[in-house]
Structures are given as structure tokens and as C-alpha cells.
């Protein structure tokens, strides 16, 4: 398995460092949606007759904090990107913010977006787009991305043919 990082993903040195320190294969490639997914190089034993990119099955969007996502909520481009992910089986929004929902309600973010509106908007995204929203420390982001990709791969190998 090789993690695919979008070429426009910024400030992800901590994630790349995690991959390198744990000898996780990765490559940079333009992704239409999301910041991360994965690919499987050709492997006849696993049933992959060619390189296979899981871009139709998985989208992982990463935000560097609540301030960034609060700014994106009002951006039509962000809404359009979420809409394009609707048919993917697995969609994740990973936010580097330990306090999560509590930090939203208590307005612990760098944006003047109303906390109740912010809280409601994220829950609307969860329901409308089937999005899994996870809050985690920056230091755990690489592990989370790898774990999600590995879990999706296991599901497809064990339960479905690509």
C-alpha cells in the first residue's frame, strides 16, 4: 500500500515525517478531492492486475485546525468538493484540534464564525455528505491517515473485488 498525498497539501511535514520514520510508502499526486487516499501497485496475488488508486472509494480531507475549517465553511469551493465526495464509500474530515466539539462551542479558534452556527454546520456536513469528522492531535495525524487507508484496503481485500 502506498499513501497518496495531494500535491497542493500544505504544512504536512509532520505527516510526511511520520510516514518516513515508520517506513510507510507515500507519493505525491494531484487528487481531485481530499488531501489523502492510497494506491496499490500491481499485485496479481491480491487481485490487482494494474496499479489501482482508491480515489473513487476514499477521500481524507485534513484541516490544520478549527480556524481553517471555520474559514472554509463559507467557501463555495469547499462545499463543492464535499458534494463531489458524496458517492465515495469512505469520507473523512480530520481536524488537528484536541478539544474538538468543546473548542467549537467555547469558541477556541481563530475566526469570528458564530460557535453555534459552526457546530451546526459541521453536523450538517456529517449528515448531508456522510462525512466522518475526527479531531486529533497533530502528532497523531500520520497514524490516523495510515490506519484509515489500511482499514479501507482490508475491507476491499476481504469483502469486495475492485
Model-predicted segments: where are they?
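Non-catalytic C-terminal interaction segments of nucleic acid-processing enzymes
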Residues: 1-55, 67-162
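Conserved catalytic cores of phosphodiester-cleaving nucleases, focusing on short active-site segments
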Residues: 58-64
Amino acid at each position: 500500500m502506498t499513501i497518496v498525498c495531494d500535491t497542493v497539501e500544505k504544512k504536512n511535514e509532520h505527516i510526511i515525517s511520520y510516514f518516513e520514520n515508520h517506513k510507510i510508502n507515500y507519493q505525491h499526486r494531484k487528487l481531485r478531492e481530499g488531501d489523502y487516499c492510497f494506491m496499490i501497485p500491481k499485485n496479481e496475488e491480491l487481485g490487482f492486475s494494474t496499479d489501482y488508486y482508491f480515489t473513487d472509494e476514499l477521500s481524507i480531507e485534513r484541516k490544520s485546525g478549527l480556524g481553517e475549517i471555520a474559514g472554509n465553511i463559507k467557501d463555495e469551493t469547499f462545499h463543492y468538493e464535499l458534494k463531489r465526495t458524496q458517492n465515495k464509500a469512505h469520507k473523512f474530515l480530520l481536524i488537528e484540534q484536541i478539544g474538538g466539539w468543546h473548542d467549537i462551542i467555547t469558541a477556541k479558534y481563530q475566526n469570528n464564525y458564530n460557535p453555534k452556527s459552526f457546530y451546526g454546520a459541521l453536523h450538517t456536513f456529517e449528515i448531508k455528505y456522510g462525512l466522518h469528522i475526527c479531531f486529533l492531535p497533530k502528532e497523531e495525524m500520520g497514524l490516523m491517515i495510515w490506519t484509515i487507508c489500511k482499514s479501507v484496503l482490508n475491507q476491499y481485500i476481504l469483502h469486495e473485488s475492485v
